[in-house]
Amino acid sequence: VIMNLMDKLTDVFRQGLSNSFYPVPQQAIRVGGTFEGWSPHDAQDIVYHVLVPLSPPPGHTFRLELNTAGMLQRNFCVHVELLCTCAREQLGEDMLCFLHHPKEELRRRQDPSLLHTLCTGDYLDVEKTVHWFYRFIRVAWLLLPDSRHWRLMLQPSCRTCKFQLRKDNESFTVEIVFGVQQRDSDIFVSSQPAEAGIPSTTWLETCAMAEAQF
């Protein structure tokens, strides 16, 4: 039920974001033991954890920069860079190159780049990304047939997107962690909760996907 719901939400996101320059959510990955029934808690208390990989939008790329600040867990910043899309424009695609078109024309004819929406400086901001996802999920949920049977209750969080679904006497909680893949590996940097005071541009390394395969 949960992964099917996540697939539906992801499809709505992709359709709604097709002409924008926000991160592109990919298929959710289940993590943790709750999916295999390992949790010792009452079903009402179970939190299902999923990882949603984020890909850069057209005209952008993500470059991971290792942060050597004194933390036990390896952490990174996600540097957002613009790419030249002039060749795509010449092929007839309806997109202006952020690097080579005048700023005034870009403001008038095209949505802002990711650098001007969810970034702090040149770096993808965890808290801005989570806040954006919360806003969008309110709208996306109403477009799903499931919304007629389940009640969605969002639970505020700074570094993850957490919500509860209720129907009659059933309920479960889902916590979404966002991730950016390290090249072609099973290692991600993620928005998982961190120690107090960590900058919002810091993403923590996680092996959750690699562990989920065993």
Regions found by a protein language model. Give the residues of each.
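Non-catalytic helical "accessory" subdomain of NTase-fold nucleotidyltransferases
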Residues: 1-214
